[in-house]
A protein has these predicted regions:
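ATP phosphate-binding glycine-rich loop and adjacent ATP-lid/helix-beta elements
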Residues: 125-130
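N-terminal accessory segment detector
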Residues: 1-99, 107-124, 135-136, 140-174
Length: 174
């Protein structure tokens, strides 16, 4: 029998993260028929609660959260820790108070197997986690999704800026 300590940590992490990424799909298949429309609300609460873990990781690893770029880099680290090395993420510095997270590969989307459009369960999960995590890490900032792979875009783009700046930008576009 092989001793688990002989398996490289990177391999164990990759395998565990792959199975963890599959869990939302399995839960959806098992519980949606029972919970019906209530399932989305319950699942959103779970992903919002998971953002507390993002805060705990940032605190425990003393990750920087003071600027938009700090937040983007911290979210990059947290998402890879929580969701595995299958995530391919970049944190781009746009200006002193703005940053963009680019997601180029998403293990959750890979588990879903296809593009689902605006009603994608992957998008709802990611949105609940990300939009809750950023202000928990620094209440002056918020996040806004600009592009998403689960709605057919080539990559996800998530803007991070001071909360009032994102609100003003959104109102101008309406």
């Amino acid at each position: 029998m092989k001793d688990p300590r002989d398996i490289p940590n990177e391999t164990k992490w990759r395998l565990a993260a792959g199975y963890a990424a599959r869990l939302p799909v399995l839960y959806d298949a098992a519980f949606r028929p029972v919970a019906g429309e209530k399932y989305d609300e319950i699942e959103q609460e779970i992903w919002m609660d998971l953002s507390r873990t993002a805060f705990a990781i940032a605190r425990d690893l003393t990750l920087a959260v003071g600027t938009a770029q700090d937040l983007a880099e911290t979210m990059q680290v947290v998402m890879v820790i929580l969701f595995g090395p299958g995530f391919r993420i970049e944190a781009l510095n746009v200006s002193a108070d703005r940053s963009v997270i680019l997601v180029k590969r998403c293990p959750f989307l890979e588990q879903e197997g296809a593009s689902f459009g605006a009603g994608s369960p992957v998008f709802r999960r990611c949105m609940a986690f990300t939009l809750t995590s950023v202000p928990l890490l620094n209440k002056k900032y918020s996040a806004r999704f600009v592009r998403t792979m689960c709605t057919g875009d080539r990559q996800c783009e998530i803007k991070i800026a001071e909360a009032e700046d994102l609100t003003a930008t959104t109102k101008k576009k309406k």
